[in-house]
Amino acid sequence: MYGQFTRVSAALANPHRLELLDLLAQREERSVEDLAADAGLSVANASQHLRQLLAAHLVESRRSQQFVFYRVAGDESVRLWQDVRDFAVARFGEVRDLVAGRVADRNPVVDDVAALIERIDRGEVALFDARPSEEFRSGHLPGATSLPLGHIDDVFLAALDTSRTVVVYCRGPFCTFADEAVAAFREHGFTAHRLELGVPEWRRLGFAVAVGDS
């Protein structure tokens, strides 16, 4: 019996496979080619890692003509990845040091997610999603506006109400897209903060997720 359990742990025992699982948690499904490009892997290498995740039932796949698409096998797969990640941060000093160096300049905005939702509903907060637009359409926090990296320009900023607090999120606590967006907003005089939760973490807390372009 225990040997069967190791099929799951063995599939997770590779940084590329963990990254692929994290990327799949952001969207309903993605092609092997798309995942390979995002993870900086060759298509052949990405395909090999994805087959390992498939064998452990952490992901599912479908074929459409010459393309193969993958998706997470369920919320359990995402929770397992999050639990491994959070355990490593809690238990390994070297991981905590790496995380501390990466997030040293952050000023997280949320201790109370329910309070953030209320502020968004009252129009006090402008919420932005710094992930690629395809991930936004697949699922995003209610009230968020898609703002992929590189889309913050003078025309965009001129249309914003400077009296509103800006909150930006991306793929989760270790994604840096939101950090770059927050820095850009602050350079232009906005009060801007980083939300460390991503869509998978938001969903795990039991809050609703919106889909589509708005």
Please tell me what each predicted stretch does.
Residues 29, 40, 57-58, 207:
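Short hinge/loop at the helix->beta-strand junction immediately C-terminal to the helix-turn-helix recognition helix
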